[in-house]
Structure formats: structure tokens, C-alpha cells
Amino acid sequence: MAHKKAGGSSRNGRDTEGRRLGVKKFGGESVVAGNIIVRQRGTKVQAGPNVGVGRDHTLFALTDGHVKFLRRAEGRVQVAVTPLAIAAE
């Protein structure tokens, strides 16, 4: 008797969850040191003053202050944190 073994159905059936990337703190918002500002793949947004970069290119605040987004030459976007002492003046 000729038998055909059942084929696998591994091509379908996946709908992966989103990675929750993007801007977490927008311009003008206050941040505490350690707060995540942007989660990204690669350096779409670059780190400015008082902003650190994680292993996965996550940008986070190094000091307490206010977030500021800046447009740089060549269409680059940079994020900085203005410290509270300066922001209060």
C-alpha cells in the first residue's frame, strides 16, 4: 500500500509580538537619571549631552532634567537632557 507521510505545517502559524520600540519620553518631559528616552534598533536617534547609550542602542538619561530633541546636519536627530539646575534658570 502506498502511504504518504503527513507533511509539516511549520510555514504558517506565527504572528510575533511587536518589540515596543520608539520614543518613550518626548521633548519637554522631565526625566530622572536612568529613565529610558528612546528604544531603537541602530542609532536612528543619536545621544547628546547627559544621554547614555545601552548595548541595544537604547538611549537613557544620565542626569535628572528635561528632554530636548535637536535636529543636526545631514538630517540627524539628537536627544539631550538639560539638567534641572540649568532648566530652572
Curated annotation (Swiss-Prot):
Stretches for region Disordered: 1-21
Organism superkingdom: Bacteria
GO biological process, alphabetically ordered: translation
Gene Ontology molecular functions: structural constituent of ribosome
InterPro entries: Ribosomal_bL27, Ribosomal_bL27_CS
Pfam families on file: Ribosomal_L27 (PF01016)
SUPFAM superfamilies: Ribosomal L27 protein-like (SSF110324)
GO cellular component: cytosolic large ribosomal subunit
Keywords, ordered alphabetically: Ribonucleoprotein, Ribosomal protein
Similarity comment: Belongs to the bacterial ribosomal protein bL27 family.
NCBIfam families assigned to the protein according to its UniProt record, in alphabetical order: L27
Descriptive protein name: Large ribosomal subunit protein bL27
Gene: rpmA
